[in-house]
């Protein structure tokens, strides 16, 4: 009988439990549980509801029991940078504030009193983003110093869920690298940097690599769900898992992990922490097997998701794509990476305001708004592809788009046209596939990453756009 492996993939807007197993030499997936996610306002801050989310994680485990498909292992992946601080009794200190909150405004200047941006990049290789853990911790230090005094443990979001499942405190490497406090040379916390910033060393747990067994379910959770399994750390940063699932074994490609964010880059064995790389705002995030994801964060489908939400989700993404195609000659463009689009009160109005401010024609219909966003994204991809080629001194023949955005046919066509490269779209469930793949590699269902990626290609295929 085939062994089942469970990926709990929690994104910014929803979470899913997806079970995978091998059947006739192919990987087969089944989504068994889904739940909503999103930040809520609490005490004037944008916060995650981690207590509710963890109940949903447990509910999905109960669903496994209910349908009689009990996994041998499971792993949780989420977005990057966010964390909890625990006191000596393992209680959460303060609100579980999310990365879109404005508490980090001005915190970069506080960090640069201890270390310059240039030196920080040389040490960590991580691109500057105001929501990185390093700046969030500075916000805690400035606004709630008592939390840092009381904190015994820092856990990133997936590590926190693994702790609630097992009672074991770990910090997984790929997630930790997103926070800008890890050395790409030692692949460990940069304790000297941590000391310079005045963050307590004792909070930072030992880093573990993806594929490491964390432990079995605690007695309490085991009794609640009715079975036991091993919790295995995947690449807990969702992009790290998605990149593991890119169905290619050569190195002649750029990938885009396309979802709420678009993460566009290449895999490499060494980090590039040069001044030029810093100026170009590339980042060196940790990947599976000690590889680096050399990439750029691009706003991604967040903009179109927000616009859809503002019309009360009255249209599917496919319908919005069709409207965009009808308005394809609309001439205006926006900078998809402008921070004004990170957390606006109203995305539709923000796009209009941007066009107005820059002296362009202002979009009025939903189709016009959508075509501005999609075309701007495709042009941003083309610009980033050129920058990657400039930084690496080589050209790439194709772009692999994985994740939910790989299903956006119109955007894929625009990207092929803008980049003049072949687009290989799929698999859409790349993050869950990568999560399950890390578990299967540990269980020796696959001997190597290369074998796993070959099977992923055979199992899910790709759609080619030229």
Give, region by region, the residue ranges found by the protein language model.
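N-terminal glycine/serine-rich phosphate-binding loop of ATP-dependent small-molecule kinases
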Residues: 1-94, 122, 150, 222-231, ...
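Active-site core segments that coordinate phosphate-bearing ligands/cofactors
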Residues: 6-7, 19, 112-125, 135-156, ...
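Short beta-strand-loop/turn "lid" adjacent to the catalytic site in phosphate-handling enzymes
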Residues: 66-98, 127-131, 162-183, 206-209
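Carbohydrate-associated surface elements
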Residues: 101
